[in-house]
Amino acid sequence: MNVFAALQAAYPADRSRVAIETDTGLLYTWQDIERATAMLANLLTSLDLHGRTLDDGTYLPPVVAAHTDKSVEALLLYLATLRAGMVYLPLNPAYRQAEMDYFLGDAQPAVVVCAPGDFQWLSRVAFQKRVRHVFTLGTDRTGTLLDRASFMSDQHRPDVFESTSLCAILYTSGTTGRSKGALLTHSNLLSNARTLIKHWGWRPDDVLLHALPIFHIHGLFVACHCALLSGSKLLWLGKFEPQAVLQHLPQATVFMGVPTMYSRLLAQPGLTRNACNGMRLFVSGSAPLLPSAFADFAQRTGHTILERYGMSETGMLCSNPYRPADGPRLAGSVGPALPGVEVRVVDDAGAPCPAGAVGHIQVRGPNVFMGYLGMPDKTEESFTDDDWFKTGDVGKIGAGQADKGYVSIVGRARDLIITGGFNVYPAEIEDHLNQLPGVAESAVFGVPHPDFGEGVVAAVVPQPGAHLTEASLIDQAKQRIANFKVPKRVFVLAELPRNAMGKVQKNLLQKEHAALFGASPR
């Protein structure tokens, strides 16, 4: 079965029920979803688009690229693309000309959909890349896409195609080089969605408060698939605003967010047990959740955040338990591997590490992507001979009574700092710094050092009203950790640089301080 067929199977018997309600008061029924996706799918198929065969023989259907702001219609475009048997490519609407030049050249979409205000410059880039069709889509249900679709029939029989057919391309963040397009199949998305629906206890009477962007796996695949494929209602916010979330929480049962969202909610006095009285689940992902935020949220609301672990190439692969009978939700851990997914930790030689030892995280299962678009060598080096995907993350699997089988992420392998021959894992140092009085959060990274190879550097954000000094922070760190782990320099910043999903961009910090110790990059 493909993703759209699974959606149709999840329609409630009464299609006049509301499926999506927006923060502006718009209501979309399940029948509206059926009709709108049919009309959009008919438009796409009327364009006589053609796919192509990749170098490895895989057929890539026509690609529809969406560079749009968040709207229900943008979600319907995604569903219609899958209904038409095509491939959906979501792109961050913040991307500008140079970035879009790369993505459109690499993915070679047949269709680009953009915000009306971006049409002039983006259509020029698109046509230079031989894109055949460029449509516009506004957040207020305007644009040429909907204008053209309005003339189409609202009846459409989805094509019959295999679950192994490609249906989406997700580009990785590309913090260490050019972004890679992960090729995902219907089977990848559907297996992951069904696992999460069962593991997190989704039911038709759930209401998901959706405040995430939809150009990312978290907001588009995890959040929307869980709700729609379980017949649940979406309460749709155009963007994340703490006050708007608090206003709508009483109408919801599930909320998914990134750590930055939770820290901003914690800054609101209105975040109380009473405000969360009807909630059954808060999920966090896309970046590590600070243990202090985990504890503060539980104390304020009576709810323990469920932290999970996933990536563009694999969907979700680990999750803390939902049901208390399955185990506790632990701070600083992403939980055990999801049912049907295998996760292991190996050393540099590829041999399995003993429980509790730090190593490289690898994953295998039906959720794992097919490969990287146009990068056969990168695809080959990312998998072992027995099909384990190398995530690039470093972590460990718990061995204690409380955390046995639970995965903890230490950091990215590329973030490992080797100073004077010793390995330093930034997450460990950050954990110690974050426990110091007055510290809100920190980021630890390495830069070239003429003597040690790399020097440990920290960027620290103070709590409101706190006065932090570099000397004091270094002195306190020396009392907690071995000297080779102590940052040689500490910078106190108003905030850490982050991407759209709240991940700290350490590459920007490294670039800014690359010449700090006067050594040349290796």
Locate each region found by the language model:
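Conserved pre-ATP/AMP-binding loop-to-beta segment of ANL
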Residues: 15-16, 152-171, 177-178, 201-207
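Conserved AMP-binding/adenylate-forming
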Residues: 26, 41-95, 423
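Conserved AMP-binding A3 loop
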Residues: 27-31, 167-194
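Structural core segment of the AMP-binding/adenylate-forming
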Residues: 83-148, 464-466
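Conserved AMP-binding/adenylation subdomain of ANL enzymes
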Residues: 190-207, 215-254, 268-270
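Gly/Ser/Thr-rich phosphate-binding loop
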Residues: 252-257, 266-328, 342
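Conserved ATP/PPi-binding loop(s) of AMP-dependent carboxylate-activating enzymes
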Residues: 322, 336-340, 349-382, 422-424
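AMP-binding/adenylate-forming catalytic core of the ANL superfamily
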Residues: 365, 370-371, 381, 394-485, ...
